[in-house]
A protein has these predicted regions:
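Hydrophobic transmembrane alpha-helices and their immediate junctions
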Residues: 186-189, 196-200, 287-325
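A membrane-periplasm/extracellular boundary helix in multi-pass inner-membrane enzymes
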Residues: 87-92, 191-233, 254-256
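Hydrophobic, aromatic-rich transmembrane alpha-helices
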Residues: 2-13, 147-156, 163, 290-308
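N-terminal hydrophobic segments of proteins, predominantly signal-anchor/transmembrane helices
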Residues: 2-58, 320-323
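Membrane helix-loop boundary segments at the extracytoplasmic
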Residues: 32, 36, 44-45, 312-353
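Transmembrane alpha-helical segments and their membrane-water interfaces
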Residues: 37-91, 296-302
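Long extracytoplasmic/lumenal interhelical loops at the membrane interface
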Residues: 219-289
């Protein structure tokens, strides 16, 4: 509530072009709250608490200068946190560090080895993915997801020391999402947006050289190249673990019913799909209904297409955001919502040197 109050205190007047996506957001949130109460996903207290979600509309409606200040503070904190964690992780990989104990993720039956500033997930008392950097987060995908988003917002500006740290962290996370989004963004940006042929050729040549240099490396093959191989049985790449047969079967079974449109109760979902399925957009449709899902995703699409200066930049924004929805389909998470808004509205990520230059110009 305090965060939303701060954003509201820096709000600006809504323009005519913003009215459509404001309405879509309010409709999506109304459907989320009303359908949730109707289907038993929330009780009276949950219903009342969920009303605060309407306040998230303050994130894209704040003054641009304030939004940029928040974005830069977040990027600095994220890069410092990840950088400190990465340094500790590298030391542990080379000479070793003492364990500080174990941590339990309540409700998800997940355990972690705790080291200074980072964790490594455990399974059956053994480390899992010890070579993948997850920092202080519950899985490496968090580093890859937020790292790719921040880099995309900055347009991969490696003159900014924070982006260099985030790039290195993303590489060591071995997040397939990070690798794919980074390459697709850079290729689309240089070919379509900037129309720089030489830069595009250099990028493709660099990727090819990277592939030749790492394809026979067991670590890179296991974590990257093997996961890009096509699986004829699942009809997707090996690294696509965003769904499973039980989720697909459930979605197919409810198609055309009221559950498909407005969702179902959490108990029914978890009892029908073992473990609640997986981190996929299909789970959002099954739980909250297709009506809410279309409105919620539609809000971010409208936000980007209404604010991006060119059609090609809007398409690039949509590619990154939709890919993120596919990879990490959280809804109403304030950090993710804010980063989408910052990306859509071209909030400027400036380094300390650039910030000083701006002050000189303004003075």
């Amino acid at each position: 509530m305090q965060t939303f109050y701060i954003f509201f205190s820096h709000k600006r007047n809504v323009t005519n072009k913003e009215i459509p996506y404001v309405i879509v957001f309010l409709l999506a949130t109304f459907c989320y709250v009303f359908f949730g109460f109707l289907c038993g996903r929330m009780n009276v207290n949950g219903f009342l608490n969920s009303l605060t979600l309407f306040l998230l509309i303050s994130l894209p409606l704040c003054k641009k200068s304030f939004g940029e200040a928040v974005l830069n503070s977040f990027a600095t904190l994220f890069s410092l946190l990840v950088g400190l964690s990465l340094l500790s992780w590298i030391i542990n990989q080379t000479i070793g560090l003492p364990q500080l104990g174990t941590l339990e993720l309540v409700g998800q039956h997940r355990s972690y080895l705790h080291y200074p500033f980072f964790v490594i997930e455990m399974a059956d008392y053994a480390a899992v993915d010890i070579l993948r950097f997850s920092g202080p987060f519950d899985e490496p995908g968090v580093v890859g997801t937020y790292g790719a988003l921040i880099l995309a917002i900055s347009r991969f500006n490696f003159k900014d020391w924070r982006m260099v740290i985030i790039l290195i962290a993303g590489i060591f996370s071995f997040s397939l999402f990070f690798y794919i989004v980074s390459f697709v963004y850079l290729l689309f940006y240089y070919v379509v947006v900037k129309k720089k042929v030489i830069a595009s050729i250099f990028l493709l040549a660099s990727l090819f050289a990277f592939y030749l240099g790492t394809k026979d490396n067991p670590i890179f093959y296991e974590y990257i190249w093997k996961r890009t191989e096509w699986n004829d049985e699942s009809k997707t790449i090996e690294g696509d673990n965003r769904s499973n047969d039980s989720v697909d079967a459930y979605l197919k079974r409810i198609r055309g019913t009221s559950e498909y449109y407005i969702g179902t109760s959490d108990d029914n979902w978890y009892n029908t799909v073992a473990g609640g399925g997986s981190a996929t957009y299909k789970s959002i449709i099954c739980i909250n209904g297709i009506i809410f899902f279309v409105l919620y995703v539609g809000f971010f699409i409208l936000l980007g297409t209404s604010n991006k200066k060119t059609k090609s930049e809007a398409i690039l924004y949509c590619i990154v955001v939709l890919a993120n929805f596919y990879q990490r389909s959280s809804i109403y998470f304030p950090v993710t919502v804010f980063l989408y808004c910052a990306f859509a509205m071209d909030y400027f990520l400036y380094s300390n040197r650039m910030k000083k230059s701006l002050r000189i110009v303004q003075s």
